[in-house]
Each structure stands twice: as C-alpha cells, then as structure tokens.
C-alpha cells in the first residue's frame, strides 16, 4: 500500500509550476505514497501538465530501420548479442522503405517519426540511407523526424542535423550506479557524451529511462534529477517488458500504480518537458493507461521495436474519451 503521507501535494505542485526542483525526499514521498493517494497525486501532476501543455497529446511512431545484430550486451534488449530471443534480424533498410514508414506515421496522426536502428553506432553507409530518407521526408511531409541510431561523434551528429533530423534519442536508461549491472560494453559516460554531441549539433536532445530493471526508488528519483540536469527536451519513460531469452526475462512487471507514480514524479521534476509514456505502456499500465496522460503528454502509437503495441484506434479513443486533443505537428 505504501507509507502514510504528510506531504502537501499543493506545495510540490507550486514548485513545479515555477519550474523549481523538488527535493529528493519529496520525490521519494511520491513513489512511496499510500496507493490511496494515487488520484490526488495524478490530480496534482495534471495541474502542472495542463499549465505547460494544456490537453494536447503528442503522437510518435517508431520505425525499426535495422533489427538485431547488435554487439552490445544490454540485459533488457532482445536484439543484444547475448539475447536468445527469436527476433527478426535485418540490416539497414533502404531509403524507399524508410520513407514508406513515414507515410504510415501520417496515417496514424503522428507528428513525429522515429527512425531507430540497432547497433553500437551507425556506419557511414547506414547514415547515407537514413539521411537520404530524412531529406525526402522533411521535404514532402508535415512530419518531424527523430533518430535513434546509437553512439554519435561530432561528424555524424552534424550529418543528421544537416539532413533535417529534428530530435535525437539516446536514453540514459538507468541510474549511473546501476548501469554496470545492465550493460558493460559501453559506459554511462558514453551515453552522456553522445547527448552532448547532439546538443552541440543543434538537434533537440531526447533521453529517458527504463523502469523495472532492479533500480531502487531513490535511484528512480535521482534518474529524474539526472534528466533535468541533462536538459532533455523529450523524456521517454519506458517500463520493462521482460522478454524471454534476455538476462532480465524473470523481472516482474511494474505495478500499474507504481508506473503512474513514476510518471507523476517525472512531471514534477521536469515540468516543462515532453514526458512520453513509451515501451511497456500496455503491458505494465494495463487498464490504467488513460490515467498516464494526466502526467504525460506524449505516447507512441503502433508497435515498438520487438514488442507489439495496441491498435492505433484504441489510443485515439483513449485521447478522445479523456477530452484531450491530438497535437498537430508544428513545422
């Protein structure tokens, strides 16, 4: 149930409305609040969400441009070199196929098209396909393009920016201290370095987390603080969908109420930022999915990289039934 609460949600709301950082203890109080406090917490988070984003919901669609064949040993990922999960494997798709995916994103009313590729870092040949596709998409469609291709250096970041990539995603994934328990083939610092290159290039930085990989509540709060310090414009909050054949296959799902508390925490700590309910939304939040949008203002529609999402029409209905509106892409 959680511990009894003496915290004033009004006080925390006032801080967030002024974009003032809450304390570590206030963050812990949110996560450890009695479950009966849930609606009060979500109401407080909604006040902040509405102040900065009204009732708009941003829709994003993922396109898996390269699947499998990844040399990294991330414990959560079915595309990892250490995974035995039966995932589809293919090299970088061509420009025509990537562009066709963008047309599907438009049909789903997405404003952002997210081109994702497995691997440690993109090769120059892979960048050729992606940048050519991005140029065609941005010249012919009312879409913003986000790319998630792995580690970047200055030259590769510059190429993506010049091609028209609006935003680049590179998640911190977990707490700095927990990172070695999740992967050892790259460091937490490697991820921060890529985000620095993204900012320097002029692309909008997108970075988030995966909840449910064995982190503590204090680490979750500190992860929210880390994202505030990074100043990511968009924060995807994933909830682990444990996949058979990966090292984390036996991790329990995050309880829906805990997931909602995490989303509220992210809103309070990063009040002016896009908070996106991302991978594992359907699997972990289940019937409480609609409540997530009282804290978050963004979702993915359709499938994820190697797991299924729900029907796009279902997401549209959730937004409509809440009295919210789909945000149109503003180019």
From Swiss-Prot:
Name the record gives this protein: Biotin synthase
Database matches in SMART domains: BATS, Elp3
Top-level class of the enzyme under EC nomenclature: transferase
Organism per entry: Bacillus pumilus (strain SAFR-032)
Catalytic activities: (4R,5S)-dethiobiotin + (sulfur carrier)-SH + 2 reduced [2Fe-2S]-[ferredoxin] + 2 S-adenosyl-L-methionine = (sulfur carrier)-H + biotin + 2 5'-deoxyadenosine + 2 L-methionine + 2 oxidized [2Fe-2S]-[ferredoxin]
Gene Ontology BP, a term: biotin biosynthetic process
Gene3D superfamilies per the UniProt record, alphabetical: Aldolase class I (3.20.20.70)
Record key words, sorted: 2Fe-2S, 4Fe-4S, Biotin biosynthesis, Iron, Iron-sulfur, Metal-binding, S-adenosyl-L-methionine, Transferase
Subunit structure: Homodimer.
Family under the similarity heading: Belongs to the radical SAM superfamily. Biotin synthase family.
Gene: bioB
Residues engaged in binding [4Fe-4S] cluster: 70, 74, 77
Enzyme Commission designation: 2.8.1.6
UniProt cross-references to Pfam families, sorted A to Z: BATS, Radical_SAM
InterPro entries tied to this protein: Aldolase_TIM (IPR013785), BATS_dom (IPR010722), Biotin_synth/BioAB (IPR002684), Biotin_synthase (IPR024177), Elp3/MiaA/NifB-like_rSAM (IPR006638), rSAM (IPR007197)
UniProt cofactor note: Binds 1 [4Fe-4S] cluster. The cluster is coordinated with 3 cysteines and an exchangeable S-adenosyl-L-methionine. Binds 1 [2Fe-2S] cluster. The cluster is coordinated with 3 cysteines and 1 arginine.
Annotated coiled-coil segments of the chain: none
Functional note: Catalyzes the conversion of dethiobiotin (DTB) to biotin by the insertion of a sulfur atom into dethiobiotin via a radical-based mechanism.
Metabolic or biological pathway: Cofactor biosynthesis; biotin biosynthesis; biotin from 7,8-diaminononanoate: step 2/2
Cofactors named for this entry: [4Fe-4S] cluster; [2Fe-2S] cluster
Binding residue positions for [2Fe-2S] cluster: 114, 146, 206, 276
NCBIfam families: bioB (TIGR00433)
Domain Radical SAM core: 52-281
Superkingdom per UniProt: Bacteria
One Gene Ontology MF term: 4 iron, 4 sulfur cluster binding
């Amino acid at each position: 149930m959680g511990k009894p609460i003496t915290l004033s949600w009004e006080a925390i709301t006032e801080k967030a409305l002024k974009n003032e950082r809450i304390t570590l203890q206030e963050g812990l109080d949110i996560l450890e609040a009695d479950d009966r406090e849930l609606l009060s917490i979500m109401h407080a988070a909604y006040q902040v969400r509405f102040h900065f984003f009204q009732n708009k919901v941003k829709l994003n669609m993922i396109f898996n441009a390269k699947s499998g064949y990844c040399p990294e040993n991330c414990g959560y990922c079915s595309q990892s070199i250490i995974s035995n999960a039966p995932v589809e494997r293919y090299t970088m798709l061509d420009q025509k196929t990537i562009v066709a995916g963008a047309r599907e994103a438009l049909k789903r009313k997405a404003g952002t098209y997210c081109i994702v590729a497995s691997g440690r870092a993109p090769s120059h040949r892979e960048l050729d396909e992606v940048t050519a596709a991005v140029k065609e998409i941005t010249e012919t469609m009312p879409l913003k393009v986000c790319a998630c291709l792995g580690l970047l250096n200055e030259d590769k970041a510059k190429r993506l920016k010049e091609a028209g990539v609006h935003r680049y995603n590179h998640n911190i994934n977990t707490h700095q201290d927990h990172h070695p328990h999740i992967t050892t083939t790259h460091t937490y610092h490697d991820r921060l370095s890529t985000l620095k290159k993204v900012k320097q290039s002029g692309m909008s930085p997108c970075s988030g987390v995966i909840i449910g990989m064995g982190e503590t509540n204090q680490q979750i709060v500190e992860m929210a603080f880390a994202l505030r310090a990074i100043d990511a414009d968009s924060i995807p909050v994933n909830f682990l969908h444990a996949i058979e054949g990966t090292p984390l296959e036996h991790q329990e799902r995050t309880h829906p109420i805990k997931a909602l508390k995490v989303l509220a925490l992210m809103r309070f700590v990063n009040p002016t930022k896009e908070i996106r309910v991302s991978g594992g939304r359907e699997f972990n939040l289940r019937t409480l999915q609609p409540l997530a949008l009282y804290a978050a203002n963004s979702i993915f529609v359709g499938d994820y990289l190697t797991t299924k999402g729900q029907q796009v029409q279902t997401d549209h209905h959730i937004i409509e039934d809440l009295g919210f509106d789909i945000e149109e892409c503003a180019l």
